């Protein structure tokens, strides 16, 4: 088994990425987290062999479109805890990527091209400023975990009904007034976290979700004596109110 070529520059107070890094085109893993980086040059596109790229905990305000040239990225891309107000459209070229974290940024939207990331299994966009998701989110047919805590999401697009592999959905601390109907047919969904929204009523179809194991409704306006909740518990679902 080939040894992965890794360059770990975590917390080196770099301020900027040394030019020498971009010449290391054999790298499989590049860790640049927590370095006070404010910009990333187009040279990032030269590292064609990268499988994992960690740019978390910096001060990046944008990411160059050349990121989309890293088509071998298959493990993880960390962009969390930066100052990103938008993501490059070229993200859609990363069809092999399995894990993407863009949490803790001031993102208000996600690019429609995200639907091209067909290999994505876990997507984290917690603590941004999202009000909804793009329709293209429904193209992520391999998605198993979706983490959206701490946004201002009022609704989910109808296309989320196509996320048939979804197991875990975190929607706590958002602005939902009803449970999104697009979840009704997701037969593999096991956990739904709806804490701290604006829910006051629940749809009957929740009791028809065959795999539902845990439903967290704390800090909403839901009446804990609703017959539906008792029914869910009899079906083996843990309900927290």
Enumerate the language-model features and the residues they cover.
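The feature encodes a structural signal of leucine-rich repeats
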Residues: 17-20, 40-43, 63-66, 87-89, ...
